[in-house]
Amino acid sequence: MQHIVEKENGGLKKMTKKDFKLYGSLILYALLPSVYLLIRMQIVAVNDVNIDIMGQIEWFDLIDEVLVTALTVPLYFLLKPDNGKTAPKKNCAAFLVSIAVYAVFTVVVMLKIGSIAKFMNAENAVQYLFIQALSMLAGFVGTFMVMIFTLNDDDKLVRRLLVSRLCLQVVADWIFISSFKDVGAAYAEIAVNAVIGLIAVLSAYGKGYLKFAMPGKAFLKDWCKIGAFVGIQIFLDNFIYAVMVCKMVNAVSEPGNYWVANNFIWGWLLVPVTCLAEVIKKNDKVRLTMKNCWRYLIMIFAVWLITMPKWKYFISGPMASDGAVIIKIVLPLIPFYITYMISAVID
């Protein structure tokens, strides 16, 4: 199996051709939905949708991030491929446990959504957030399967899921947003995530990546140990962010603008970084350190600097938002995300 790095003269290491192919597929999977977000923003503008309600997903999505991180990050180590392939029984056992845990948390969140929204100064978005909770549960299925495909170097399946998602999202948004406004965006997400999840599971079975089995005690013990550590860390980070930033943003009635700014940062600027981190996690046996990844980070940062003068026009045009206002939110955050770039690839 090829690993994330190979030795060169002098001990310096680099990504392999196979890794670059996977990296490209992951970037497409992450970036093309951002391209579609440009279309969604136009749909939102045409249908006079309340962007401040849709912007509440900014903090609500942190719940999903905590669960996904706690459940999947340990699996990059526990589901190590044998002879280039992961064990189908382990994959299935991990999936069954993960979806059960996620479902329980989803029910709890839905039962407490009124109190959560009130705490975050988002009482006007209770219905939207309630539906989004179901959407995130459906979306987790696809997210889990993409992890399985990534571990098995199946970039073709990742690309197929991407194309399917984009086509379905176009149709779903036009149907649901035009009929149900802001809540329609949540309905569209449920529909698309459910279909993509079904396609992903069937594809995984068809490829032999899943075979029914229940998890063993030793496997669960190791999973819980790593997951608890990772989950607590990301929970503390996100809780502080939600309370200190998102709650304050809601208090001054700016969730819509902050949501757009965050979409620009995470949907465009940080995509190469997050995808690089995914490739690194997959190839955990040889850790990528600053000695051999600095070149990739510098290239990413160089692209930022080159394109920075055009950011405001991009936000004003394709993103159909107030570029002057959004750029004032984005620029002060850049130093923090430079730090994130470094930490993401060496954690």
Residue ranges and their predicted role:
Residues 2-24, 123-124, 186-189, 198-238:
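Interhelical loop/hinge segments that connect adjacent transmembrane helices in multipass membrane
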Residues 22-30, 62, 132, 158, ...:
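Residue-level signature of transmembrane alpha-helical cores of multipass secondary-active transporters
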Residues 39-44, 239-248, 264, 280, ...:
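Hydrophobic/aromatic end-of-helix segments at the C-terminal termini of transmembrane alpha-helices
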Residues 43-66, 124-126, 222-226, 245-267, ...:
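Interfacial/gating helices of multi-pass transporter permease domains
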Residues 53-103, 142-146, 150-153, 255-304, ...:
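Small-residue-rich hydrophobic transmembrane alpha-helices
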Residues 103-130, 302-324:
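Short membrane-interface helical motifs at transmembrane helix boundaries
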Residues 120-145, 160, 260-268, 318-347:
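Alpha-helical transmembrane segments of multi-pass membrane proteins
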Residues 161-173, 179-208:
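Hydrophobic alpha-helical transmembrane segments
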